[in-house]
Amino acid sequence: MSGGTTGERPFSDIVTSIRYWVIHTVTIPSLFVAGWLFVSTGLAYDVFGTPRPDEYFTEERQEVPIINQRFSTN
């Protein structure tokens, strides 16, 4: 069974091209900076609805919350 060609460029040609590295020297660090800003600004907490570190325990409630009726419909 002979494999055919898909018409795509070989990966080795892509990685060794100047154009690849010109594009990716900008995009790869940009992704890291965007992720760092997403987390450091607190936007990740707002988007995913998780409590911020200072919101786990409030002034009124300092003990660990225990769930007794987790699957109750009441």
UniProtKB/Swiss-Prot annotation:
UniProt entry keywords in alphabetical sequence: Cyanelle, Electron transport, Heme, Iron, Membrane, Metal-binding, Photosynthesis, Photosystem II, Plastid, Thylakoid, Transmembrane, Transmembrane helix, Transport
Pfam families named among the record's database cross-references: Cytochrom_B559, Cytochrom_B559a
Recorded superkingdom: Eukaryota
Subcellular location field: Plastid, Cyanelle thylakoid membrane
Family according to the record: Belongs to the PsbE/PsbF family.
InterPro entries, per database record: PSII_cyt_b559_asu (IPR006217), PSII_cyt_b559_asu_sf (IPR037025), PSII_cyt_b559_CS (IPR006216), PSII_cyt_b559_N (IPR013081), PSII_cytb559_asu_lum (IPR013082)
Gene name, Swiss-Prot/TrEMBL: psbE
PANTHER family cross-referenced by the UniProt entry: CYTOCHROME B559 SUBUNIT BETA-RELATED
Function summary: This b-type cytochrome is tightly associated with the reaction center of photosystem II (PSII). PSII is a light-driven water:plastoquinone oxidoreductase that uses light energy to abstract electrons from H(2)O, generating O(2) and a proton gradient subsequently used for ATP formation. It consists of a core antenna complex that captures photons, and an electron transfer chain that converts photonic excitation into a charge separation.
Biological process, per Gene Ontology: photosynthetic electron transport chain
Residues spanning the membrane: 22-36
Ligand binding (heme): 24
Keyword Heme: yes
Cofactor binding comment, as recorded: With its partner (PsbF) binds heme. PSII binds additional chlorophylls, carotenoids and specific lipids.
Protein name in UniProt: Cytochrome b559 subunit alpha
One GO term describing the cellular component: photosystem II reaction center
Cofactor: heme b
Description of how the protein assembles with itself and partners: Heterodimer of an alpha subunit and a beta subunit. PSII is composed of 1 copy each of membrane proteins PsbA, PsbB, PsbC, PsbD, PsbE, PsbF, PsbH, PsbI, PsbJ, PsbK, PsbL, PsbM, PsbT, PsbX, PsbY, PsbZ, Psb30/Ycf12, at least 3 peripheral proteins of the oxygen-evolving complex and a large number of cofactors. It forms dimeric complexes.
